[in-house]
Design a protein with these regions (language model features):
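Histidine-acidic metal/acid-base catalytic patches
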Residues: 2-42, 47-62, 140, 197-219, ...
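Active-site acidic/histidine proton-transfer and metal-coordination neighborhood
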Residues: 12-14, 33-35, 91, 111-216
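Short glycine-enriched loops at secondary-structure junctions
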Residues: 47-49, 100-104
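Catalytic domains of carbohydrate-active enzymes, especially glycoside hydrolases
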Residues: 57-74
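Glycine-rich, proline-tolerant flexible connector loops at the mouths of alpha/beta enzymes
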Residues: 71-90, 147-151, 191
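Glycine-rich, aromatic-flanked loop segments that form ligand/cofactor-binding clefts
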Residues: 93-101
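Conserved radical SAM core fold
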Residues: 104-109, 150, 188, 248-254
Length: 306
């Protein structure tokens, strides 16, 4: 997840058509404290932009029944802002989701963690070391890792071996602190051409190779639907290496119900698996403004009833 990608998400998307959610759009604002959701769906800054700044949005999310929060850019924020966010979440009994531990240089197609330059791997490990303090300030357990880009001059197998090796070294850094790095596979068809890790199954293979509780896979279902599809069987096959989940519908990368993914069935399967982790709402709102925020809440109420 890049800063530019998050900026796009938090800005909101232009409406591409009305989707009936079966819930009145004004219902979300009617109650000051709504019942808590049954799963830990995590909005992000911008999900409720009309309600104020980051702290105000956290308070509003809690009042609407959300029990978690996600902030990809938390590691880049001043320490005082990190501390304030952690305090706000603690006061609302909310769980902190992921932040990005090592941000790729998207426009440069770097780093090449499986390439020939050890300096790129050392830079990545330095980011991981710095992220330990961030995680402690935020009271976060999971941090997102993007395993970089492909080196088209090298065999994929060589790159896989090197990425397994560098992730083992990273695990040695975070495991003593009981932290988990979740590797995020990204789609190459729409958003991120050239990345190394392109599917949950590929992430599963790397995680198995690392063989550490500190290295798992982030199952972003928006990316997986574009790249591979077959979502529920993939989740089942890779379940023991999945450490975190993110939602987002396709096309459009907006809230559930705006695209082709049957999120009610996904939720049923997560319940059957007794999934108790955070589910990041890493997507935009299809409709701008307060009406779009109400639709967002209604969309999650609809799938949470599944």
């Amino acid at each position: 997840m890049s800063l530019s990608r998050r900026s796009v998400l938090t800005a909101g998307a232009v409406a591409t058509g009305a989707v009936a959610l079966g819930t009145a759009t004004g219902a979300a604002t009617a109650a000051a404290t709504a019942p808590r959701f049954s799963l830990h769906y995590a909005p992000h800054e911008g999900s409720f932009a009309s309600r104020g700044g980051r702290i105000e949005q956290i308070a509003f999310a809690a009042d609407q029944g959300f029990t978690a929060w996600e902030d990809n850019e938390a590691g880049t924020r001043p320490v005082a802002e990190q501390v304030a966010m952690a305090k706000a979440l603690q006061q609302r009994n909310m769980t902190m989701g992921v932040f990005v531990a090592s941000m790729p240089k998207w426009s440069q197609f770097r780093p090449l963690l499986g390439g020939n330059d050890d300096a790129e791997r050392e830079g990545f490990l330095a980011d991981i070391r710095a992220s330990v303090a961030v995680a402690k300030r935020l009271d976060a357990r999971c941090m997102t890792v993007v395993t970089g880009f492909m080196d088209r001059k090298l065999p994929v197998e060589i790159q896989t071996g090197r990425i397994i090796d560098v992730m083992r070294r990273a695990a040695e850094i975070v495991e003593p602190h009981k932290l988990v790095m979740v590797m995020e596979p990204l789609n190459t068809r729409t958003n991120h051409p050239g990345v190394y890790m392109q599917s949950i199954a590929q992430g599963y293979a790397v995680a198995k190779g690392v063989n550490s509780p500190a290295v798992k896979v982030l199952a972003d279902l928006y990316h997986e639907q574009i790249q591979s599809g077959n979502l529920i069987p993939t989740l089942e096959m890779c379940w023991d290496e999945i450490g975190y989940i993110q939602f987002g519908d396709n096309p459009g990368r907006n809230e559930p119900g705006t695209g082709e993914i049957h999120y009610q069935n996904i939720v049923r399967r997560l319940r059957a698996r007794n999934y108790a982790g955070v589910i990041g709402m890493e997507h935009g709102n299809q409709v701008d403004g307060r009406a779009g925020e109400d639709r967002l809440i209604a969309a999650y109420r609809a799938i949470d009833r599944a």
